[in-house]
């Protein structure tokens, strides 16, 4: 299935977090500032901040929309097709807040993150302009600052997160999974590089068999900081 996004307008262009798919963001803070790794950047706890990109696209075109979702687990395969349009809107909201500061020798922090992505059939009056899919992604994140110079740059942090993703649907359209995501942050000049490998948590009632074959076992995010 070939997809591309046409961004007609942005409610907000945010320079935080990771890049997803083909989203374009402008980085205004360094990796260290976004995660408050240095003492000078500490802002305390329970301050709501942007996390991943926040955006809205008025037009997203899919050549072959998934009208009848299927799974390798037969209990999670739709039995009927839905009359989805090829064009829909899409938006994402994402925030984080620090809940514990200065753990483990006064340096580690615990954050709570939440991301919600919606695919909206706003142009489809036949189904009352319903949401085709809404994905919810809460996570608990631990970050610990490090300073290790390598290749004229510096490793800035290590950490991990407990991540849950779900579409909040009932059978047979329910999709959810859990994983542990590891974080390694590196800065060189104005470039920020984050390596995020993950391990999937076992699930006795597997809704997504072999999901890592489709989305992989990690991601690398590269961003540039405009001074």
Language-model features and meaning:
Residues 68-78, 85, 100-224:
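Outer-membrane pore/translocation modules
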């Amino acid at each position: 299935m070939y997809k591309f996004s046409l961004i007609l307008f942005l409610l907000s262009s945010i320079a935080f977090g990771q890049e997803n798919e083909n989203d374009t963001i402008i980085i205004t803070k360094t990796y260290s500032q976004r995660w408050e790794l240095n003492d000078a950047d500490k802002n305390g706890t329970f301050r709501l901040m942007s996390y991943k990109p926040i955006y809205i696209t008025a037009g997203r075109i899919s050549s072959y929309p998934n009208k009848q979702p299927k799974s390798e687990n037969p209990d999670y395969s739709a039995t009927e097709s839905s009359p989805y349009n090829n064009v829909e809107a899409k938006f994402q909201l994402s925030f984080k807040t620090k809940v514990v500061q200065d753990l483990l020798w006064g340096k580690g922090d615990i954050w709570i993150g939440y991301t919600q992505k919606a695919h909206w059939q706003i142009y489809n009056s036949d189904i009352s302009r319903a949401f085709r899919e809404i994905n919810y992604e809460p996570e608990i994140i631990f970050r610990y600052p490090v300073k290790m110079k390598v290749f004229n740059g510096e490793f800035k942090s290590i950490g991990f997160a407990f991540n849950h993703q779900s579409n909040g649907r009932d059978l047979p359209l329910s999709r959810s999974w859990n994983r542990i995501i590891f974080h390694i942050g590196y800065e060189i000049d104005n470039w920020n590089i984050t390596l995020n490998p993950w391990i999937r948590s076992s699930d006795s009632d597997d809704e997504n068999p072999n999901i890592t074959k489709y989305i992989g076992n990690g991601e690398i995010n590269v961003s540039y900081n405009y001074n």
